[in-house]
């Protein structure tokens, strides 16, 4: 630095080195002299106490002069030296920048040289199938290229060429690695590659090459070197994902979905093969322990032969990062594999009966052992997987499956044929399951109130209710509905021995059965219920049968179900009105249909007018015959189907409709000749004689006579109809006698206006008729 300042001063031309040195030396000596004089003066002043005032002032003047000289010299040095120093600094900065640019260029050239060397060495290693060194050299070339790209001053065209070269070389090594991978890991597929058929699965094979094949002329690298090279190049996840998907599709999933399929491991001197064989079995789905064992066998072979291979020492360069191939493959296949095991194996192992739940512990244990073995092989990490969670949550799955099976079975029964019937009634044996007696702890405690009587007499009622008072009357119901009710009882019985959660689900599943019936049956069988009167009657009975059981169904199980359900919710009574209404509305709709058909047939009778005309009489007679035929047909269709009381009311209502229509038409006639009256009487006599025959609720004719004799009870217009027949054949005197001043049977049957109208229609206008009309008041 001193030489640099000297050089600057030498070039300045304003100050010479020798001159400065001389003057500085002189100043130094002068300073020393003055210092000595000052010390001497102080000594004299304070030590010797001599008057030295004048000498001191002179010395002060000399010091001030010397200080001024020093300041001037310093200012001159700073001015001239700083100016020349600034000029030199700029030159030095320029030189430094040039040096930095040269260093950058030199560094870029060095990176280019390293890139070129790496590519050359890579080509040599690739030619010798030393994939790991080749991959590492390619990685070094990649790093060199990244450094070159980070320098903005580098030629973009050259960078593009280098990038393209690197891409080509990477694809080249990947191609060679892929070729050797296909030789080391060989798949053999059937022509169709169809995994759904057993024949195709039996033709699928996987071969893992462990040593150099004799037929192979060129040496093959080891599987470990290929996998490590893939890892260095960043392609290992992609390769393992592709392998894992094929493993799932062609080996693991077929083993789970096909119970007869088993894996066979064949070991050759230079390879290990995984193929299939079929063993006869009656199972539609493999038991979980068997499926786990088949999967574990395949994964053990893969873990030993493919995923846990040592790296060749002569191929390693530096530290090799730990690669857990089994863990990587496990991440690829486990989610789909566990889902497949759940859907095709564990789901079907769920017991259908709560008594078998205890046996399911074996399956839970086998699932735990299966996961433990996979963790030991490092296919799985430490967390509990969905497979084991599913197996342990057996109570919930059992309840869900049981409820699903119940609803499916119920819907199948609801959509089955209605006309397949069974007879029920007080005398028929029920096949509903017997309920166990409640334990002593569950018995209902009845509080007995003690009442004191003054006179302790016999408190029993004189008359008692018939034992059948609360029984469902004898009728026929669908066999499917009887099975449906049995299913409801069995499900509730199952709930009594189940866990709280399961019991609640089963109870509400039974309620859902009846809600489903209310929605499905009227919709699914709508057309048949509208067209076929027998099915409408059976459906009516079905609804009444269900409502009858719902009245006491909850009460029967209240003391046996879990306490959660014993707070008043264990009931089905709220469903009873809906079922009664459902059955009644369906049957009433059928009754309206039958009424419409009867009235339509009677409309062809031409209002029963002009019966002396053969054509009119024939039409009326035909209409009456058709109506009676329809009623008899309905009587046969509903025979032994409807309860007797419902049957008689229904037939009585329809017959009453016919009779009321005939009465209305006849009483509306304005003129009835003698011949007309005779023929009208004949038509009415036909109805009167054959009408009771439609009352045949039972198949035994002898038992039906009772109901045929009680026709007036069910047909309100029966007695007026008989009075009408009498009037058609009676004289004015007889009519007057039957009126009996408004107290006779005729007055009970008809109002006076209708009686007068009939008299006017039947008899000519004479004094006798006028007298008779006068009596009708």
From Swiss-Prot:
The region called Interaction with ZWINT is annotated at: 2-81
The UniProt keyword set, sorted, is: Acetylation, Cell cycle, Cell division, Centromere, Chromosome, Coiled coil, Cytoplasm, Cytoskeleton, Endoplasmic reticulum, ER-Golgi transport, Kinetochore, Lipid droplet, Membrane, Mitosis, Phosphoprotein, Protein transport, Transport
Q: Which residues carry this modification: N6-acetyllysine?
A: 775
Coiled-coil regions listed in the entry: 14-130
Q: Where is this region: Interaction with RINT1?
A: 2-316
> Can you list the GO cellular component terms from the UniProt entry?
cytosol; Dsl1/NZR complex; endoplasmic reticulum; endoplasmic reticulum membrane; kinetochore; kinetochore microtubule; lipid droplet; nucleus
Example GO biological process term? Answer: protein localization to kinetochore
- What is the protein name for this chain? Centromere/kinetochore protein zw10 homolog
How this chain assembles, per its entry, is: Interacts with NBAS and KNTC1/ROD; the interactions are mutually exclusive and indicative for its association in two different vesicle tethering complexes. Component of the RZZ complex composed of KNTC1/ROD, ZW10 and ZWILCH. Component of the NRZ complex composed of NBAS, ZW10 and RINT1/TIP20L; NRZ associates with SNAREs STX18, USE1L, BNIP1/SEC20L and SEC22B (the assembly has been described as syntaxin 18 complex). Interacts directly with RINT1/TIP20L bound to BNIP1/SEC20L. Interacts with C19orf25 and ZWINT. Interacts with ZFYVE1.
Membrane-related topology note: Peripheral membrane protein
Q: What does this protein do?
A: Essential component of the mitotic checkpoint, which prevents cells from prematurely exiting mitosis. Required for the assembly of the dynein-dynactin and MAD1-MAD2 complexes onto kinetochores. Its function related to the spindle assembly machinery is proposed to depend on its association in the mitotic RZZ complex. Involved in regulation of membrane traffic between the Golgi and the endoplasmic reticulum (ER); the function is proposed to depend on its association in the interphase NRZ complex which is believed to play a role in SNARE assembly at the ER.
- Organism encoding this protein: Rattus norvegicus (Rat)
Residues that the record marks as modified (N-acetylalanine) are 2
Q: Where in the cell is it found?
A: Cytoplasm; Endoplasmic reticulum membrane; Chromosome, Centromere, Kinetochore; Cytoplasm, Cytoskeleton, Spindle
Family, per entry: Belongs to the ZW10 family.
Q: Which residues carry this modification: Phosphoserine?
A: 3, 12
């Amino acid at each position: 630095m001193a030489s640099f300042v000297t050089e600057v001063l030498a070039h300045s031309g304003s100050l010479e080195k020798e001159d400065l040195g001389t003057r500085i030396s002189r100043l130094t000596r002068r300073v020393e002299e003055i210092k000595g004089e000052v010390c001497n003066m102080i000594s004299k002043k304070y030590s010797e106490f001599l008057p030295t005032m004048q000498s001191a002032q002179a010395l002060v003047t000399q010091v001030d002069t010397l200080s001024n000289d020093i300041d001037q010299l310093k200012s001159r040095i700073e001015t001239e030296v700083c100016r020349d120093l600034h000029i030199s600094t700029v030159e030095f900065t320029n030189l430094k920048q040039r040096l930095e640019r040269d260093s950058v260029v030199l560094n870029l050239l060095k990176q280019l040289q390293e890139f070129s060397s790496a590519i050359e060495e890579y080509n040599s290693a690739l030619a010798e199938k030393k994939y790991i060194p080749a991959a590492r050299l390619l990685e070094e070339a990649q790093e060199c290229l990244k450094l070159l790209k980070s320098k903005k001053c580098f030629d973009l065209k050259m960078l593009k060429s280098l990038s393209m070269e690197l891409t080509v070389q990477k694809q080249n090594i990947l191609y060679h690695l892929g070729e050797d991978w296909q030789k080391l890991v060989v798949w053999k597929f059937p022509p169709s590659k169809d995994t759904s058929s057993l024949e195709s699965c039996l033709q699928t094979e996987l071969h893992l090459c462990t040593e150099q094949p004799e037929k192979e002329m060129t040496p093959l690298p080891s599987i470990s070197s290929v996998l490590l090279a893939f890892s260095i190049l960043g392609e290992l996840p992609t390769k393992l994902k592709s392998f894992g998907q094929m493993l799932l599709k062609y080996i693991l999933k077929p083993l789970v979905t096909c119970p007869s399929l088993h894996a066979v491991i064949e070991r050759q001197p230079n390879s290990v093969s995984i193929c299939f064989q079929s063993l006869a079995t009656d199972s539609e789905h493999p038991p979980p322990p068997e499926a786990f064992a088949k999967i574990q066998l395949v994964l053990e072979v893969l873990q030993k032969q493919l995923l846990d291979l040592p790296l060749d020492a002569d191929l390693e360069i530096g530290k090799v990062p730990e690669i857990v191939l089994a863990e990587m493959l496990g991440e690829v296949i486990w989610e789909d594999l566990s889902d497949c095991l759940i859907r095709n194996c564990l789901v079907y192992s769920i017991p259908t009966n709560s008594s078998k739940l205890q046996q399911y512990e074996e399956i839970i244990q086998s699932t735990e052992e299966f996961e433990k073995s996979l963790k030991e092989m490092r296919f799985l990490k430490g967390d509990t997987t969905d497979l084991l969670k599913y197996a342990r949550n057996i109570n919930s799955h059992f309840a869900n499956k049981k409820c699903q099976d119940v609803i499916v079975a119920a819907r199948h029964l609801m959509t089955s044929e209605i006309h397949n019937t069974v007879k029920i009634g007080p005398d028929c044996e029920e096949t509903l399951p017997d309920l166990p007696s409640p334990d002593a702890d569950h018995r209902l405690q009845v509080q007995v109130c003690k009442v004191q009587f003054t006179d302790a007499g016999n408190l029993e009622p004189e008359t008692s209710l018939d034992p059948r008072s609360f029984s469902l009357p004898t009728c026929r119901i669908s066999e499917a509905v009887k099975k449906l009710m049995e299913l409801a009882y069995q499900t509730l019985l199952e709930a009594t021995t189940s866990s709280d959660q399961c019991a609640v689900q089963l109870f509400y599943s039974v309620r859902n059965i009846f809600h489903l019936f209310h929605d499905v049956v009227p919709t699914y069988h709508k057309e048949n219920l509208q067209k076929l009167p027998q099915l409408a009657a059976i459906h009516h009975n079905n609804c009444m049968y269900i409502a009858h059981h719902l009245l006491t169904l909850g009460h029967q199980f209240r003391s046996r179900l879990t306490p959660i359900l014993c707070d008043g919710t264990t009931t089905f009574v709220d469903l009873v009105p809906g079922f009664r209404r459902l059955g009644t509305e369906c049957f009433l709709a059928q009754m309206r249909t039958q009424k419409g058909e009867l009235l339509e047939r009677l409309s062809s009778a031409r209002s029963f007018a002009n019966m002396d005309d053969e054509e009119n009489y024939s039409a009326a007679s035909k209409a009456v015959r058709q109506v009676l035929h329809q009623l008899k047909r309905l009587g046969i269709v509903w025979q032994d189907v409807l309860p007797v009381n419902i049957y008689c009311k229904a037939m009585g209502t329809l017959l009453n409709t016919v009779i009321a229509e005939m009465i209305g038409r006849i009483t509306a006639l304005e003129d009835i000749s003698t011949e007309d009256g005779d023929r009208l009487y004949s038509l009415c006599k036909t109805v009167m004689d054959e009408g009771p025959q439609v009352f045949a609720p039972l198949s035994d004719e002898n038992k039906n006579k009772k109901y045929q004799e009680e026709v007036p009870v069910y047909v309100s217009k029966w007695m007026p109809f008989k009075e009408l027949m009498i009037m058609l054949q009676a004289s004015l005197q007889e009519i007057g006698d039957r009126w009996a001043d408004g107290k006779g049977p005729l007055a009970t049957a008809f109002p006076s206006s209708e009686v007068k109208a009939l008299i006017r229609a039947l008899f000519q206008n004479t004094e006798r008729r006028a007298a008779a009309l006068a009596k009708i008041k």
